[in-house]
Amino acid sequence: MTKSYNIIHHKFDVIVVGAGGAGLRAAFGMAEEGLNTACISKLFPTRSHTVAAQGGISAALGNMGADDWRWHMYDTVKGSDWLGDQDAIEYMCKNAPDAILELEHYGVPFSRTEEGKIYQRPFGGMTTEYGKGKAAQRTCAAADRTGHAILHTLYQQSLKHKVQFFIEYFAIDLLMENGECRGVVAWNLDDGSLHCFRAHNVVLATGGYGRAYFSATSAHTCTGDGGGMAIRAGLPLQDMEFVQFHPTGIYSAGCLITEGARGEGGYLVNANGERFMERYAPAAKDLASRDVVSRAMTIEIREGRGVGEHKDHVFLHLNHLSPEIVHSRLPGISETAKIFAGVDVTKEPIPVLPTVHYNMGGIPTNYHGQVIIKDGKNHNSVVKGLMSIGEAACVSVHGANRLGSNSLLDLVVFGRSAALKAAELIKPASPHKPVSEEALEKIISRFDKIRHSSGNISVADLRLKMQRTMQSHASVFRTQEVLDEGAEMISEIRSGYKDIKVNDKSLIWNSDLVEALELDNLLDQALVTVYSAAARKESRGAHAREDYPDRNDKEWMQHTLSGVDEAGKVVLDYKPVTLTTLSDEVKAIPPAKRVY
């Protein structure tokens, strides 16, 4: 089969798959350390989904009032509903201020205070004095286009450090040999050639799989390609049942309205004009954490207090804010609301609805970005040659629920951490370990089989079935009956993949084949998401069970590990949450009731 294709071979010290914030930070960090680094991306780097991040990036700089990284750590652990690993959370929060200053030195054009300091806004779940004080202004912002500013800056740094880019290359599968990763195979969409990239280290920075759902703030390119490759390589994914619904997606369109809108003073109302969040989170109100706000909105709509003709959404008010504040601090969402909801935010409320936004789960890693698996009694056995960072990974700093503005921080802190670890492990230009012909043949055969699929189901129809099933059966509120039914339906949809039809058999710019490969990645992750959710009989963070409304630390304070065997069956396992810190500078935060 390999002889049927034009295969071009490459050798690098490191291959980074994905050119979003995490991938670029790792790529130029590794190049800066003297490693011969390549970055593969299925789209132009500045089109990566990091560009859509709006509100900001968190760090305890203290520019707008007293702050401390330990308070940030407390908020993140509490936000995670005690499913986050406290060693990784300490590492992230402690390194956050330096990460922001580093970005500023690279050229990120942060908004400024009148004194010239980096502007910071309040965000949900961010407090002072270990939750006892007032809301913290911790989120560093570049207006409401922070991700755009960071991504362009990181791309410029990558060019400066001479990272070699392979743009519009679709990563097909990992080259695995004896449990080690030795490279990756990719397809060049521009000329149809296949490329075998050999490397001492492969970094998966491919983002989330939001497009497994019908309505998501994610771009259509967010298909979790790294997670799909990991599952096919026999690796488990972690905590996949935890899917974040952002409270404020524009009704019907799904486009994101940043939490920064509420940070600047925006508030939610129901059909009675009531600021209902005061009932659900008396202290934090509209700036409670995202899972709390999404559930409150869903309850209001269910109980008949929704707005609009069908009473199926709520309103976000910004029209009490001065137009100057809106136009200087929230220019992007003013434009988004005008285009997708037809409203002038200075005069009218924005119709909003909880929308799939972020995957807390992903490829399990340690805080160096190294992929880890459970091997006997060792829960943190490192998979040689493989790293993962960003939304594709599960460190786990977000646990059962991510706090807004911690995602951009996650990208840059662990992108840098992975670069430092790779430099420590790899000697530049050292010889590569061999890869068997069988390993390459297996990857090419799968690619060829999908390319020549001639069944009866269109990729678009099967994808839509999956998306609608996930939207209805793995949503904000869940029950055993609905989850079990969803698991059966997704299993059936996945088995239907054998009968797909790919009409275009060409190799150059074949979007039909790209979508078929992406759907394969999405289906495996949809499958483990719904099975993991059905198995977790408690409510924690974004996983809200109506039949098990309470958190159960005794039985369920543990990470879910989920994989798919060769027969297509989901295999579940569990490992404990890390409740110890890295240093003596901060004490571990014991589990407590989570109220805002």
Curated annotation (Swiss-Prot):
Q: Where is the active site?
A: 290
Binding, FAD: 18-23, 41-56, 225, 391, 407-408
Reactions mediated catalytically = a quinone + succinate = fumarate + a quinol
Q: Which UniProt keywords apply?
A: Cell inner membrane, Cell membrane, Electron transport, FAD, Flavoprotein, Membrane, Oxidoreductase, Transport, Tricarboxylic acid cycle
**GO CC terms in record:** plasma membrane
**GO BP, one annotated term:** electron transport chain
The family database entries (NCBIfam families) matched by this protein are listed as: sdhA_forward, sdhA_frdA_Gneg
Protein name as annotated? Succinate dehydrogenase flavoprotein subunit
Report the gene name.
sdhA
